[in-house]
């Protein structure tokens, strides 16, 4: 009897030990489980915005398990990151009759800004509808146990997705400070330069008036133009309840949803702008990797007379043959090596033009790594957000050839404000003018000195951007959902500075007095 009791006791001990060991293993597995991040790239246009989101996905895959939402036939996403084995891809099927991806095509033929805005709205709504009408994608995302969703701020509908999935979200603002929309405070508007505001002093009254006008325009464009369409799509695809969708204040939801905002800016001049704690500057992020492939490294190392990098982004394929011949002629007269990114025109170039021996053509180039090389002396650029940031970061003078949209603002910022180059009107180009401006920049030390100073200021301002990204993500993962839900946006009249408000308030009075004066003069004449 005692032996039987002893056997039972031993069996009980064994079972208890097994249960404890199993519990310990499960606890260990939970503790060691890597947080899962869902990244929604910006697929509306092939641009710096989409490129940065893809680069961010690759960077984060070294620290987290990252899944990327992507359209099945999206060439841009597929080309750049689909072969990365550290990333998981959640594909959704296109609803279009063709296999062409939904993508904006911004032309250089005088396309009006309103047409661009209309395209962003329509394409954004179309992609949102396609993504989350796919029941398989929505099921995969909901069951994926994701700790965080990261999205681009121009994906206006993602706030609805975050609320539906009930997970923390971070928005990435890749258009610089000018795209910061903070409905809780106008502090940003009072000190941060917006689009076109390089024409005024940084902290002057005129600057604040311009910035406030842009803020109000952006505010009402979102409220009256973008957000109603987003709410309609969200209701149609089941993210919002049909009965309550019309009563949703999407402006408030869009403001409350992001736990944090990562701001990628290329402007060292706004370094001291006051930012709320949830806004984190990451200018210069992901630019520290400057490793070159052997092909490029060999060319750069042997070019002791210096290298000129030429890249026009998406504008590379928009120049006519006359303009291209003028460029080739000017580049061929230089003693420097020219590395030219020409996009998909490689075969056309070789068959159509005689390429000088000092000019090397590539369909794409590792621009950031090339600018970091000590032999690089100049960047000829369209002045996009990515190119100008890389030029500032590495202290390389520029010859700016702005083509569209914010590129003219970027060009003025670098040439007028920072003094690190010159601007050239590519539409009135002559080979002699191009050659002379390149030679002038290369022979004037002031441009290089100013570029180095801008680089120093920029790096001191946005220190440790990669660390800032990781810390922000860590905090967001550990934060409760709807952390900002107790805050309500105030009306802009409550936030606007007193002097600007006085000026705005006096305008109707001034107009009224002018009308009275005009009527009085007319009556006297009668």
Give the positions of each predicted feature.
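Nucleotide-sugar-dependent glycosyltransferase catalytic domains
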Residues: 2, 6, 29-36, 42-45, ...
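Cleavable N-terminal signal peptides of Sec/SRP-targeted secreted and luminal proteins
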Residues: 7-25
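Conserved beta-strand positions in the Rossmann-like core of class I SAM-dependent methyltransferases
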Residues: 67, 339, 399
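A donor-sugar binding/catalytic signature common to diverse glycosyltransferases
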Residues: 73, 149-151, 363-411
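Short beta->alpha connector loops at strand-helix junctions that form conserved
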Residues: 90-95, 173-174, 382-383, 400-404, ...
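Nucleotide-sugar donor-binding patch of glycosyltransferase catalytic domains
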Residues: 188-189, 281, 351-363, 389-431, ...
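Donor nucleotide-activated moiety binding/catalytic core segment of transferases
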Residues: 305-306, 314, 339, 343-345, ...
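Conserved donor-nucleotide binding/catalytic region of nucleotide-linked donor-dependent transferases
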Residues: 417, 421-422, 427, 435-454, ...
């Amino acid at each position: 009897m005692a032996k039987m009791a002893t056997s039972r006791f031993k069996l009980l001990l064994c079972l208890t030990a097994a249960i404890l060991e199993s519990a310990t293993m499960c606890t260990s597995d939970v503790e060691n489980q890597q947080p899962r991040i869902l990244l929604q790239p910006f697929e509306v246009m092939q641009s710096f915005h989409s490129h940065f989101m893809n680069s961010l996905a690759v960077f984060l895959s070294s620290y987290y398990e990252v899944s990327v939402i992507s359209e099945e036939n999206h060439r841009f996403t597929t080309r750049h990151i689909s072969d990365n084995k550290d990333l998981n891809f959640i594909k959704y099927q296109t609803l279009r009759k063709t296999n062409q991806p939904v993508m904006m095509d911004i032309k250089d033929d005088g396309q009006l800004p309103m047409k661009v805005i209309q395209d962003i709205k329509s394409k954004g709504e179309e992609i949102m509808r396609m993504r989350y009408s796919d029941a398989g994608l929505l099921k995969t995302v909901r069951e994926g146990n994701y700790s965080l969703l990261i999205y681009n701020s121009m994906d206006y509908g993602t706030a609805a997705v975050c609320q539906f999935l009930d997970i923390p979200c971070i928005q990435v603002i890749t258009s610089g400070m000018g795209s910061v929309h903070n409905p809780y405070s106008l502090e940003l508007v009072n000190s941060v330069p917006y689009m076109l505001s390089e024409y005024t002093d940084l902290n002057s009254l005129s600057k604040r008036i311009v910035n406030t006008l842009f803020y109000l325009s952006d505010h009402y464009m979102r409220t009256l133009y973008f957000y109603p369409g987003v709410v309609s799509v969200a209701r149609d695809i089941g993210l919002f309840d049909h009965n309550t969708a019309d009563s949703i204040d999407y402006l408030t939801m869009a403001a409350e949803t992001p736990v944090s905002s990562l701001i990628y800016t290329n402007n060292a001049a706004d370094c001291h702008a006051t930012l709320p704690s949830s806004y984190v500057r990451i200018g210069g992020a992901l630019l520290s990797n400057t490793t070159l492939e052997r092909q490029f490294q060999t060319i750069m190392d042997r070019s002791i007379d210096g290298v000129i990098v030429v890249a026009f982004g998406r504008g590379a394929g928009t120049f006519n043959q006359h303009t291209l011949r003028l460029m080739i002629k000017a580049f061929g007269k230089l003693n420097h090596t020219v590395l030219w990114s020409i996009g998909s025109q490689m075969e056309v170039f070789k068959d159509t033009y005689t390429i000088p021996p000092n000019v090397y053509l590539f369909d794409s180039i590792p621009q950031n790594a090339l600018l970091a090389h000590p032999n690089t002396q100049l960047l000829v650029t369209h002045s996009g957000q990515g190119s100008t940031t890389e030029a500032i970061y590495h202290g390389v003078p520029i010859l700016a050839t702005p083509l569209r949209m914010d590129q003219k603002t970027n060009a003025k910022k670098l040439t007028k404000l920072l003094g690190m180059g010159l601007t050239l009107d590519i539409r009135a180009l002559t080979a002699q003018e191009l050659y002379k401006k390149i030679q002038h920049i290369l022979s004037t030390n002031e441009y290089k000195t100013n570029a180095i100073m801008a680089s120093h200021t920029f790096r001191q301002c946005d220190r440790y951007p990669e660390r800032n990204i990781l810390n922000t993500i860590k905090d967001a993962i550990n934060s409760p959902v709807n952390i900002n839900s107790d805050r309500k946006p105030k009306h802009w009249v409550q936030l606007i500075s007193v002097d600007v408000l006085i000026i705005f308030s006096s305008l109707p009075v001034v107009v009224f007095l002018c009308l009275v004066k005009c009527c009085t003069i007319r009556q006297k004449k009668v």
